[in-house]
């Protein structure tokens, strides 16, 4: 029985071997027979790039381009293994305690594109904020819902020792303070304490001009685009800087804010009569007359001061029209007191600024543009003082960049900020948002200056998918045709095929993104939800509701009186000046005696 079973097993083995051989032969025959069918033509990469050389980056190329960093927020928050790398997180490997982030540590701007609900905040922004806090980068973040401030305000302050400021435009009474004249006031005070400190005086004047320029450009454009009205806007800019300087010099501490500037200009528009029969004059002219001739405020207002009365009125009205946006009782609670974080503190200390903009109230959107513009321009001044770049990198995480109105000068921010260690991460839903706010030319400038592009998750009818499919380029693949007649014939040729077609982009799974960087081949990257990175949120960061504080304004008459006290004018003795005229001048036209009838 044992021998029989052994023989049976041998027969079974032989039978199995025969069946395997038959299967292999059958597969080979099917492949050969099907080779001249349409299914036999595979879109494999061939040729030498005749129709395109697009391809995905290899593993070795990815290692050379991006830095793998163990993502350990639990240890980081204890002050352990803090990363020395600063940059942008663009990918993830592993999860939880074994998560490894792919980080781009270059001085680059980033454009993040994804439809609503794709997880731009949960997959991309939160890991980047954690790395920013752990590596010590100061950052500004915009948010329409307020979730980012609530979730990361506590973490940044409690675990990483950040100065945190929440500028809540939805609830200004629950917002930190942000006096946009803070730096002007600060340096004017330093100069008034030490009149030999010309550097402080120059900085006060510089920040006054920056603030004035930012406010005048709220409505869009600059002097180059105003055409024939350029004079009025340029003169209004000088006038505004002049009043800001005077307010910083003569105003009390609680009076030096932007709403006081509005009130002063409006009061200075009024006219008075210097003498019973004299021509009425504006109080603005009276104020300027009281200043010494070498005072910078007088020089800045020179264009308006030396214009006709009608032109001067137009200039002052232009300035008032720009300041109208600040007339809001709630906004006054945020704008008319101190400043939680100014540009110098932002650059020199670990600081986080969260701007919450209300989706339901677009009238306050101008403040986002104003705050970002002013902060950026002030950072440029600090960078120039440090040899052209900042000591530590700062990040601007502009979530919903396509939702809030145009930021004047955004194109220049993308063009010039990178070399000064200012990195901008603009997060949008689709390209049409950029084109709507910045028109085609502005959109191209912004996209051309973003060296890193991350995108994924497109709506079924998205036009952005077509643009990005084209941007990925084409590869050379095999194509051909099969003719079925008496004898089957097959012709093969090379064609160009997109690296990823539009439908392939639209069907990408959630959490999968494509990363393109200047000078490298694109890569497919996976990002995970924040809790899979090991990120845990603490209690929400909330500011108490502040009671309405009384706002003080600088009075026109007080300002004129203060100027008179500080710069007393010597009364000039009226003297007649005799003008002698040579008789030769009248030889041609001799005077005639006139007879007067009485």
Where are these regions (language model features)?
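Basic- and hydrophobic-enriched, low-structure N-terminal and domain-boundary segments
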Residues: 1-118, 122-130, 135, 173, ...
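Short intrinsically disordered, low-complexity coil segments enriched in acidic
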Residues: 2-3, 464-467, 471, 520-523
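N-terminal short leaders/motifs
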Residues: 53-58, 77-97, 297-311, 458-462, ...
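A short glycine-/small-residue-rich loop at the edge of a beta-strand within enzyme catalytic domains
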Residues: 62-66, 77, 366, 401, ...
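P-loop NTPase motor domains
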Residues: 89-97, 101-422, 437-438, 503-524, ...
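Conserved ATP-driven motor cores of ASCE-family P-loop NTPases powering translocation/secretion/packaging/pilus
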Residues: 414-514
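Short, surface-exposed polybasic-aromatic patches that bind anionic ligands, especially phosphate groups
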Residues: 528
């Amino acid at each position: 029985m044992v021998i029989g079973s052994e023989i049976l097993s041998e027969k079974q083995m032989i039978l199995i071997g025969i069946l395997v051989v038959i299967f292999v032969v059958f597969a080979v025959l099917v492949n050969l027979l099907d080779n001249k069918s349409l299914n036999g033509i595979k879109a494999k990469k061939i040729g030498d790039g005749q129709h395109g050389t697009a391809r995905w980056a290899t593993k070795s190329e990815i290692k050379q381009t991006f830095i793998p960093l163990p993502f350990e927020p639990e240890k980081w928050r204890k002050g352990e293994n803090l990363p020395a790398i600063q940059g942008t997180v663009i990918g993830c490997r592993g999860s939880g305690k074994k998560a490894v982030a792919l980080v781009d540590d270059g001085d680059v701007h980033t454009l993040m594109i994804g439809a609503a609900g794709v997880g731009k905040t949960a997959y991309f922004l939160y890991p980047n904020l954690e790395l920013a806090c752990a590596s010590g980068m100061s950052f500004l973040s915009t948010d329409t819902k307020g979730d980012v401030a609530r979730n990361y305000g506590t973490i940044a302050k409690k675990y990483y020792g950040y100065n945190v400021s929440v500028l809540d435009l939805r609830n200004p009474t629950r917002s930190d303070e942000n006096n946009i004249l803070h730096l002007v006031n600060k340096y004017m005070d330093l100069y008034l304490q030490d009149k030999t400190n010309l550097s402080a005086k120059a900085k006060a004047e510089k920040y006054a001009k920056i603030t004035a320029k930012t406010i005048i450009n709220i409505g869009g454009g600059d002097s180059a685009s105003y055409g024939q009205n350029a004079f009025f806007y340029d003169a209004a800019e000088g006038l505004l800087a002049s009043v800001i300087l005077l307010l910083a010099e003569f105003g009390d501490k609680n009076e030096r804010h932007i709403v006081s500037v509005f009130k002063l200009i409006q009061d200075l528009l009024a006219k008075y009569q210097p003498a019973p029969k004299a021509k009425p004059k504006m109080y603005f002219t009276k104020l300027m007359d009281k200043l010494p001739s070498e005072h910078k405020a007088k020089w800045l207002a020179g264009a308006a001061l030396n214009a006709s009365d009608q032109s001067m009125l137009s200039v002052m009205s232009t300035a008032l029209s720009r300041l109208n946006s600040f007339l809001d009782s709630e906004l006054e609670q945020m704008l008319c007191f101190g400043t939680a974080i100014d540009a110098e503190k932002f650059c020199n200390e670990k600081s986080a600024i969260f701007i919450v903009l209300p989706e339901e109230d677009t009238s306050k959107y101008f403040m986002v543009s104003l705050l970002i513009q002013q902060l950026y321009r002030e950072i440029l001044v600090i960078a120039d003082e440090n040899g052209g770049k900042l000591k530590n990198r700062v990040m601007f995480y502009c979530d919903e960049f396509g939702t809030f109105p145009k930021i004047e000068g955004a194109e220049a921010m993308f063009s010039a900020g990178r070399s000064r260690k200012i990195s901008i991460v603009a997060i949008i839903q689709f390209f049409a948002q950029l084109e709507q706010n910045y028109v085609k030319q502005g959109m191209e400038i912004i996209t051309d200056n973003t060296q890193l592009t991350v995108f994924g998750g497109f709506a079924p009818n998205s036009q952005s998918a077509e643009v990005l499919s084209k941007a990925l380029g084409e590869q050379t693949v095999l194509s051909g045709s099969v003719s079925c007649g008496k004898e089957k014939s097959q012709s093969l040729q090379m064609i160009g095929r997109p690296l990823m077609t539009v439908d392939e982009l639209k069907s990408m799974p959630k959490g999968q993104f494509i990363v393109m960087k200047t000078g490298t081949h694109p890569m497919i990257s996976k990002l995970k939800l924040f809790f899979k990175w090991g990120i845990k949120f603490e209690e929400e960061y909330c500011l108490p509701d502040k009671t309405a504080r009384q706002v003080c304004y600088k009075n026109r008459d007080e300002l004129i009186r203060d100027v008179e006290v500080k710069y007393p004018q010597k009364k000039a003795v009226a003297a007649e000046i005799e003008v002698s005229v040579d008789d030769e001048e009248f030889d041609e036209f001799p005077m005639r005696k006139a007879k007067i009838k009485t």
